[in-house]
Amino acid sequence: MTVFQALVLGIIQGLGEFLPISSSAHLVLVPWLFGWQYAGLTFDVALHLGTLISIAAFFWKEWIVLIGSALRRRGTHEARMFWYLVLATVPGAVMGYLLEEQAETVFRTPLLIGIMLIVMGIFLYWADAKKPAVKGMREISMADSLLIGLSQAFAIIPGVSRSGVTMTAGRALGLSRETAARFSFLLSTPIIVGAGLFKLKDITPGDVNTAFITGVASSALVGFISISFLLKYLTGRSFALFVWYRLVAGLAVIVLAAARQFGF
């Protein structure tokens, strides 16, 4: 892998992990389009490490409050929110563990990715247009958390988008756009930590090179910017921009995949 490729993929990870457009889809599609070889497990760890840095840098104060409240003050909003996030993490973690092999093989076909980009774009539009922006963080219930966590299990399929499906579920349950995004970002922390640690066991110090560092740095920086951008963007706007992007990108991928399939 070249440093340029690492930079491009790091930027894609930083954008796609937090914007509702699917990082896994784009990390499959870009090498497919340009004929790049699979970056390998080592670089997967680099990308997860980068996005972990970005989410930790943005939300570290909130996580300290949540953890501290869970340990010391039962019954508070922050303590409940910590355990809601733990509960919501379980379905996605279980599905990720059980279907890891399929996620790396069967699910990584451009045609399926194109279809899922469109399908989830339609669901996001429906949920965002149907529900009023009512619930804030303090109004999230245990049932809301569990349902959002269950939706996260579908993110094992590239094109669905972990952030996209959890924000869609949040909007369908009546969360405001900013609240749906914030809860999704907090929920991503244990998933990203778990995925990184699970893969980290196979990495040696010799695997850390310039491309690895470039991937970490670019995904971390772009990820931080993406989080900040989306939270501000959604205070006065809808998800329509991302819906249109998913529809257009999904259609383009399907057409291109079909053209390559039939030799055009």
UniProtKB/Swiss-Prot annotation:
InterPro entries: UppP (IPR003824). The chain crosses the membrane at residues 1-21, 40-60, 81-101, 109-129, 140-160, 183-203, 211-231, 239-259. Coiled coil: none annotated. It comes from the Bacteria. GO terms for molecular function: undecaprenyl-diphosphatase activity. It is a multi-pass membrane protein. It holds the Pfam family BacA. Its main location: membrane. It catalyses: di-trans,octa-cis-undecaprenyl diphosphate + H2O = di-trans,octa-cis-undecaprenyl phosphate + phosphate + H(+). It is an enzyme of class 3 (hydrolase). One of its GO terms (cellular component) is plasma membrane. One of its GO terms (biological process) is regulation of cell shape. The keyword Transmembrane applies. Its EC number is 3.6.1.27. Keywords: Antibiotic resistance, Cell membrane, Cell shape, Cell wall biogenesis/degradation, Hydrolase, Membrane, Peptidoglycan synthesis, Transmembrane, Transmembrane helix. It is found in: Cell membrane. Bacitracin is thought to be involved in the inhibition of peptidoglycan synthesis by sequestering undecaprenyl diphosphate, thereby reducing the pool of lipid carrier available. Catalyzes the dephosphorylation of undecaprenyl diphosphate (UPP). Confers resistance to bacitracin. Belongs to the UppP family. This is Undecaprenyl-diphosphatase. It comes from Pelotomaculum thermopropionicum (strain DSM 13744 / JCM 10971 / SI). The lineage of its organism: Bacteria, Bacillati, Bacillota, Clostridia, Eubacteriales. The gene is uppP.
